[in-house]
Amino acid sequence: MSEQKLAVNEYLKTDSDYLRGTIQQGLNTAVTGAFSEGDQQLIKFHGFYQQDDRDLRNERKEQKLEPLYSFMLRARVAGGVCSPEQWLAVDKIASNLTSANSIRLTTRQTFQYHGIPKRNLKTIIQDLDREALDSIAACGDVNRNVMCNPNPVESKLHQQAYAYAKQLSDNMLPHTKAYAEIWLDNEKLVTTEGEEVEPVYGQTYLPRKFKMAVAVPPDNDVDVYTNDLGFIAVAEGDELVGFNMVAGGGMGSTHGEVSTFPRLADDFGYIKAEDSLKFAEAVMTIQRDWGNRENRKLSRLKYTIVKHGFETFKAEIEARTGIKFEPRRDVVIGDRGDRYGWKQGVDDNWHLTLFIEGGRVKDLPGQPLQTGLREIAKIHRGDFRMTSNQNMIIAGVASADKEQIEGLARQYGLLGKLITETRGHSIACVALPTCALAMAEAERYFPDFLTKVEALQQKHGFLDQGIVIRMTGCPNGCARPFAAEIGLVGKAPGRYNLYLGASFEGTRLNKLYRENIQEAEILDQLDTLFAQYASQRQAGETFGNYTVRSGVVAAVNDAAKDFHG
C-alpha cells in the first residue's frame, strides 16, 4: 500500500504520540471554544466529539461570532450496567455542567452528554472517574462500547454473558496513558523510543470504528448482526457454554455511493466461551492488518470480509487462534424490543423496564423523567441497566421495595403512559441540532411522526401489531435504520429515503423503496401499504416479511450485490 494514498486520519494517528496530539494545548486555549482540526479527530478516542448548535449558526455568523461550539461526551459502560450511586453522579453532571441539562441514553447501551463547553470537559471526566466511569474508547478507531443483552428474566445467564462482555471491553481498551495524563493529571510516563505501548492496536489503531455485542437468545435487542463482531450465547440449561460467532456487520453508508452499503454479519461457527477473547483479538488484529486505510468510507470490517472473501477471512481467524470453528449451534433469534413493565427474575428479584422516548432523560412538562430516575436512584439497591433501545431497566428490585419503586415511577411520569408495540420497538438518532452529519431531523421529529403512523395502524386495524421503525438524520446509521422494517434516513431538511423489507428479528436488511420524499408522501405510501398488509397478510406474518413476499421490495440476501441492485 502506497503511503501517499493513506487517509489523512492515518497520519494524524501516527503523529499523535499515541493520541496525545496537541489536545492539552487546545484545552488551555481560551480564545476559542474549539480544538484544532487535527485534535478534533483525536478527541474522539477520548470519548467526545466537537459540535455546534446548528439552529444558531446563521445568527452567530451574522453577528460575526464563531459557531456556538460544545462537545458531546459518551461514556464507556459495558453492557449498560451502572449502580444507583453512579447514576446519581451522572445526573448531577448533566444538571450542573452541560447546557442541555439532560442525559441521552444511546443505541449502544450507554449515555452521552450534549452541550458541554470546552472549559467543563476536564471536570466532567474527573467527576466520572471518581465514580469508576470513563469515556476511553467510546468513540474513535477502536473497539466501542460492548453491548450485552440486559435480560431481566434469565438473571444467571445474563450475569454470565455480561461477564464476557465486560472482559471483551476491558481487554480491548487502548493501552496509551494519554487519557490519564490529559484529563486526570497523571504524570507523563517516560517510554523508550519504539516501545510497543499498544500490543493489539499498534501505533495507528484500527482503520475505523469497531463494534461488538453479546446476545442471549431468543432476545436480539442488541441487534447482534449489525455489529462488526457478535457473540450469540449458547446455553446448556442455565449455563453459558459457548457462542455462535458472527462478524462483518455494520450500518453506515453514503448517499449516492454504491460502493458503500449496510451489511449484516456472517455466521462463522461455534466457539467455546473461554475462547471468545482469543477470537475477538484475532478478528480485530486481522482488521487492523487487512482493513482499508486509504478510504475511510470503505474501511469497516464488512468491506474487508467482502474484499478477501468469507473463507479466506475464516481461515485467517483459525490460523491466528489455532482453533477451528465448530458447526454453529441451533438457536432461535427473536424479538428486538424491550420487555416493558415488571418482570420477575429467576432469583425472585424484580426488574422494571421503563420506556424513555428517544432515550432523552430530561424533565418535561408533566413528565419530570430526570427527577424521577434521580429519586429512584436514591433508594434503589440494585442496578440501573441501559438498553440498546434507549430505555432504562431498574434491575434487581426486592419484593419488599417493589411498591415504593413503582410509586415513584408513576409519580414522575415514568409509568402510566400507554406505549404501542410499534413505539416500543422504534428508535431514532439525535440528529439536529447538534450532530454535524445530520441532513434532517430525527429525535425531535420522530415522536410526532410515530403518532401519525400509529393512527394509520389504527385505521387499518392492526395497532396491536408491532412494526420496527427507525429514523436517522443521515446514512451513517446510528439508530440501525437499515435493519428496520420501516427505515427512514435523512436526505435533506424534511426529506427522507424510505426503506422497507427488513425482518422483525433483525436477520435481513431492508431495501430502498422511495427516495427523497417528504412526510405527506411517506404517510401516503404507508397508508396504501398498510391497507394491503391488513387484507393480504398471512397468519403471524410481520410487516417486513409481507413487503418481501408480496414483491413490494426484493429481499436483500447479499448486501454487496442486492442492497443497491
From Swiss-Prot:
Q: Which Pfam families match?
A: NIR_SIR, NIR_SIR_ferr
Q: Where does siroheme bind?
A: 478
Task: Note the coiled coil stretches, chain numbering.
Answer: none
Please verify whether the record's keywords include Oxidoreductase. Answer: yes
For this chain's UniProt record, which GO biological process terms are given? Answer: cysteine biosynthetic process; hydrogen sulfide biosynthetic process; sulfate assimilation
Where does the sequence pass through the membrane? none
Q: Which UniProt keywords apply?
A: 4Fe-4S, Amino-acid biosynthesis, Cysteine biosynthesis, Heme, Iron, Iron-sulfur, Metal-binding, NADP, Oxidoreductase
Protein residues bound to [4Fe-4S] cluster: 429, 435, 474, 478
**Catalysis: reaction(s):** hydrogen sulfide + 3 NADP(+) + 3 H2O = sulfite + 3 NADPH + 4 H(+)
What is the required cofactor set for this protein? siroheme; [4Fe-4S] cluster
Q: Which cellular components does GO assign to this protein?
A: sulfite reductase complex (NADPH)
Task: Please give the InterPro entries that the UniProt record associates with this protein.
Answer: CysI, NiRdtase/SiRdtase_haem-b_fer, Nit/Sulf_reduc_fer-like_dom_sf, NO2/SO3_Rdtase_4Fe4S_dom, NO2/SO3_Rdtase_4Fe4S_prot, NO2/SO3_Rdtase_4Fe4S_sf, NO2/SO3_Rdtase_FeS/sirohaem_BS
Question: Pathway it belongs to?
Answer: Sulfur metabolism; hydrogen sulfide biosynthesis; hydrogen sulfide from sulfite (NADPH route): step 1/1
Question: What Gene Ontology terms describe what this protein does at the molecular function level?
Answer: 4 iron, 4 sulfur cluster binding; heme binding; metal ion binding; NADP binding; sulfite reductase (ferredoxin) activity; sulfite reductase (NADPH) activity
- List its EC numbers: 1.8.1.2
Q: How is the cofactor bound?
A: Binds 1 siroheme per subunit. Binds 1 [4Fe-4S] cluster per subunit.
| Summary of subunit composition and partner proteins | Alpha(8)-beta(8). The alpha component is a flavoprotein, the beta component is a hemoprotein.
**Function in brief:** Component of the sulfite reductase complex that catalyzes the 6-electron reduction of sulfite to sulfide. This is one of several activities required for the biosynthesis of L-cysteine from sulfate.
* Membership in a protein family: Belongs to the nitrite and sulfite reductase 4Fe-4S domain family.
What name does the UniProt record give this protein?
Sulfite reductase [NADPH] hemoprotein beta-component
Gene of this entry: cysI
